[in-house]
Regions:
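C-terminal catalytic "cap/lid" subdomain
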Residues: 3-189
Length: 189
């Protein structure tokens, strides 16, 4: 029952996000990873990339999210948004990944947005990168930043932006111009 309840909660949250995007004029579609993820011992082995590619080609914004997944070793597990994006990025080769959250970007110990984080600047920031305000089984901001820097190292040229999904119109502006100095850019160099 717990697995199904978590799946339901993730899907309901995604529906709220998609509804808000549609209301703001963004043609979004929710694509649940649980429908196609094959996971073994917590690691995604396969994930259908075709629906995401088709959505992008049709001019739709795939609203991807962390979700439950069946796991051949554990029975069930949670796959984070970052794990889903990491898997998809290897096949789809995006120039940018945009990660909307509750804060204006990645915050330093003083609560200020860090405009840019690279592998070289990360060690000084790690002590400030705690977990999230609520329960986050995927590791919080430190894990998000580290995994996205790992992905940008594996995919040279990939840039990632962490920004507030609560600012009206910001997602639309970033979709049109991802170089805008909003939030925090994560890149290998």
């Amino acid at each position: 029952l717990g697995f199904a309840a978590v799946s339901d909660a993730a899907a309901r949250l995604n529906r709220r996000v998609v509804s808000a995007l549609l209301a703001a004029g963004v043609p979004a579609i929710g694509l649940p990873p649980s429908a196609s993820a094959a996971v073994a011992d917590g690691v995604i082995q396969a994930l259908a990339t075709g629906p995401v590619a088709a959505a992008l080609e049709a001019g739709l914004l795939p609203a991807l999210f962390g979700d439950v997944a069946f796991d051949s070793v554990r029975g069930g597990t949670i796959v984070s948004t970052e794990e889903v994006l990491g898997y998809l990025a290897h096949d789809l080769r995006p120039a940018w990944l945009l990660l909307a959250g509750e804060t204006a970007g990645v915050l330093d110990a003083g609560g200020r947005v860090v405009p840019r984080i690279t592998r070289a600047t990360l060690p000084a920031l790690l002590p400030a990168l705690g977990g999230s305000r609520g329960t986050d089984v995927t590791g919080g901001m430190a894990t998000k930043v580290t995994s996205m820097l790992d992905l940008s190292a594996a995919r040279p040229g990939l840039r990632v932006r962490v920004f507030s999904g609560l600012v009206p119109g910001l997602l639309t502006r970033l979709l049109l111009a991802p170089d805008l100095p909003e939030g925090t850019e994560l890149s290998e160099t």
